[in-house]
């Protein structure tokens, strides 16, 4: 919670102006961003974020087994890449998101957290 607050997340604004998670799931699934092989999801250490999105989309608990989680990932988020995982196999990519973005000449968007 502190991390989110330090990053600028406004819990009170979210409480008063946010949308229910069921509606978010409906918007996300009907947006064309899920179950679409033309969309590519790129994250940095995004497993927990995908976990929350899957739990919201599925409207029940996540699978107990990792294989079940990845089965669901492959359905809803057909193409996903986690730069933190990819960098393990690339010697010259070291450090956190900001450093890697700079090395790849990619503009970082969002606050560091």
Model-based region annotation:
Residues 1-113:
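Metal-dependent phosphoesterase core characteristic of DEDDh/y 3'-5' exonuclease domains
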């Amino acid at each position: 919670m502190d991390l989110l607050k330090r990053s600028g997340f406004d819990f009170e604004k979210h409480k008063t102006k946010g949308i229910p998670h069921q509606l978010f799931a409906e918007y996300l699934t009907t947006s064309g961003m899920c179950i679409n092989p033309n969309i590519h999801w790129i994250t940095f250490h995004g497993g927990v974020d995908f976990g929350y999105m899957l739990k919201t989309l599925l409207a029940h608990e996540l699978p107990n087994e990792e294989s079940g989680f990845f089965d669901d990932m492959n359905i809803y988020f057909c193409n996903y890449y986690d730069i933190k995982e990819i960098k393990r196999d690339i010697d010259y990519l070291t450090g956190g998101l900001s450093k890697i973005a700079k090395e790849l000449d990619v503009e970082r968007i969002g606050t560091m957290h």
